[in-house]
Amino acid sequence: MSSQNMLSSLPGRTQSPVNLPRGAHPGAVLLSPKGSSANLQALGTNPTSPSQQPLFLNDLLNQQQFSLDSQLHLRDDLGRPSNMVSPLSNSAMNPTASNGSTFLDTFSRPTSSMAINHQPLPLQHSNSNANVMVNFTNDVNQLCNWISMLTPSQQNTVMDNLLSSLNEEVLHSTKLKLDSLVHSGYISPQLGPIASPIPNKVQSQVHQAENPQPLNLDSVLNGDNIYRQWSPLPQNTASPMQQPMYDYLADIPRPRSADPYNAFKKGGLSSGNANNNSNNGNAISNLNSSNPFGTNTVSSTNMSNSNSSSSATGRKNMNQNQHQNQYLNRPQSPTNIKANVFNKTSLATSSSNSGNALTTVNSASSTTSNFNCTNNSMNAKGLCDPKLLKNVPAWLKSLRLHKYSEALGSKPWFELIYLDDEALENMGVSALGARRKLLKAFSIVREYKANDMIDSSAF
């Protein structure tokens, strides 16, 4: 009977932790409210009484914490690729996780033991500081080893994330250290890789858009998003034209010097120079053949006159070529076709007259060639305008010689055109170029007046 009473006083098998399934945690019954209260009632113990306390409670909680930590480590190791190593463990990242059973232990501890545990507080504080320093040193060493195992692109990503979270003073001191290392020659600046292959990140970006998760160091490096969030998306490198080293194959804008209009214009200038040289040779040969018995003085004078006339003719031909190029390249309207045809015929006539003038030696032909040259360069029609002839300052302004208006504006135009070089110099026209320009304009107006081509309203 006594043995039966003892067996009846023991708790049933439904309340025993031995009856739990094999995969359950060992402290599940103790942590559950029903199971823990039933066990305590069956055992007849008070959780707060110091006389009776379960000695195996701390062991079970420690085993539970150890199993949780091991499962978390296994999950991290299975979800992480083989070449990626986590720099910090879960216990290091969460130092308070190991003290998760502190709250439960308070119910099973006697008050005397709690008082004894509170007495050596400075010693525990110093031990905790030492443990924190050791843990910090270990974490730093693990972080350095982990960074050394990364690829350059992954190291760049880590540095981008670190720099954005550092303090301004730390960034400044880091910059000073880098500058000192570079200037001392310990670290030499290196150029980035050229045409390095960039992996395609389209699938990873779609996956991240479907499953948004909070970013941390492990998720950034374990996933495919190894680029900064604010950086532009990498381009697909299927074609070699997108690489920097193939930039020389890209289309380059055509320079203005290779334009056909400029080439044609330069060709016109070269043809004008060629005409000038050929005209000089023709003039000299014609002079030598027409005056075989002349003296040296007369021949030299004629040669100088012919050289001046031929140079003027060369300038005239160059101007003609430029005008022709402008007329050819200018878009023409139906109203301007007749004017262009008239100008072309007049240019052809003047060029033929200049060619005829080069074949003769007398002074009349040289005067005609000079007249044709100045006629084209000074716009004879504008010089013989009656309104300009009446207003001598305006006439001088059309020649860009308006600064001599005070010296020459007092004389009428029909007296002014008969002045020579010496008279102009005496009147205050000291520049040789200005006097030559005025003499050419005077000769044009005199020619028009002799042919009665000036309107009578100008007198």
UniProtKB/Swiss-Prot annotation:
Residues 387-448 form the SAM domain. The keyword Transport applies. CDD domains: SAM_VTS1_fungal (cd09556). InterPro entries: SAM, SAM/pointed_sf, SMAUG/VTS1_RNA-bind, VTS1_SAM. Gene3D superfamilies: Transcription Factor, Ets-1 (1.10.150.50). RNA-binding protein involved in post-transcriptional regulation through transcript degradation. This is RNA-binding protein VTS1. It comes from Kluyveromyces lactis (strain ATCC 8585 / CBS 2359 / DSM 70799 / NBRC 1267 / NRRL Y-1140 / WM37).
